[in-house]
Amino acid sequence: ITSTHRSLAVSEKTVPGDGIANGAEVLAAADIAARRVIAADFDALAIAQGSVISASLFGALAAAEVLPFPKEAFEAAIAKGGKGVGPSLKAFVAGYDAARAGAPLTAPAKTLPRGEIPKGPAKLLAEWTALTTRIDRLPPEVADLARPGLKKVIEFQDLAYGRAYLDRLDTILAQDRAPFDLTREAAKHIANAMSYDDIIRVADEKTRAARVTRIAGEMGAKDQHLLHLTEFLHPRAEEIVSLLPARMGARWAANPRRMALIDRLFNKGRRMRSDSLRGFLTLHILGGLKGWRPKTLRHATETAHLEQWLQTALGYLPLNYDLAVEVIRCRRLVKGYSDTHARGLSKFDKVLAAISLVKDREDAADWARRLREAALKDEEGKALDGAVATINSFL
């Protein structure tokens, strides 16, 4: 008896790349090993009844008829518990019915969110329409990824930032050719690079109404309940300095004494109640600093790194199209916030440095792919170090 919903294991979360195991393979193995398999999304069934998964799994156990107890005995056991009896019985029945119905042995499909019609001032809507019109003129295979990319960068910053995104995409498209693999990959990875995680974005995400609604739903909170949210914060000196004006921040970052002082002041674990007025306003003010972001050291650093990455990819384009595509794909190594971002950036730089060593080989694109995959295998970078050592051995 198993639930088809997924709760990611620590080993899946800590992989730098996509470490999520294939749920379909797990279910297929269960089908081979077990005499009989009962599988359904028992977690969703329980949540829909305001209960927990143990109640719906209890119902599935009753439906399996492998224990010498009638259904009524299971229900009586729930009633004797005396806590949350009503929702638990409903979840029990839902699990029982799902097991009896014989739910298909497949992992649940991901539901993609449906697009929303934008609303706002007429001037901004006109600018938005102009940007979407530019996307409509792109090749269809590029436009499919450029649309969500445009939405992402505008949500991160503003419409002008969206224009900059499309300008970068047009520059690449002008040098591309059908079937436009280079521009298609760039549409996705440029959007991710432009929407980097900084203090402003993290604070903004923590004060979104959708986040509070999601957490309340996960906790089963009702209208009559008070929801207390505690944020765990651990800012580093680098993150504090990244909010300073670019030139000033660069001077501070280059001064070890100043960085040590900031580290002593800020680099400690903190708990902040974001449901309190003070905590919420602090995060809300930080999240509202989008207008300040383009002036910061972090923005200058990210933009310079982005431009250098694109310049490197386009530099390989005339002689090796596939290598240019692989360099664009290497951007997936850079993700996350704080230490995670720093580790990803270090791996990215190491991969591109190794690619430059094999750029003249016929199999350069294949080596670029191997290096990227090696970098994604483990957090410590041991696989990447091994791949680089292999390259150095035949140079």
Task: Annotate each predicted stretch with a short phrase.
Residues 55-64, 97, 184-199, 283-288, ...:
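Short, hydrophobic/amphipathic alpha-helical patches that form generic packing surfaces
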Residues 1-155, 164-170, 248, 252, ...:
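Active-site cofactor/cluster-binding pocket
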Residues 45-53, 84-87, 174-186, 321-325:
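Structural motif
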Residues 197, 203-395:
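C-terminal amphipathic alpha-helical interaction region
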Residues 8, 30-34, 60, 64-65, ...:
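Structural signal for hydrophobic packing residues in well-ordered secondary-structure cores
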Residues 119-126, 137, 141, 156, ...:
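Alpha-helix boundary/N-cap detector
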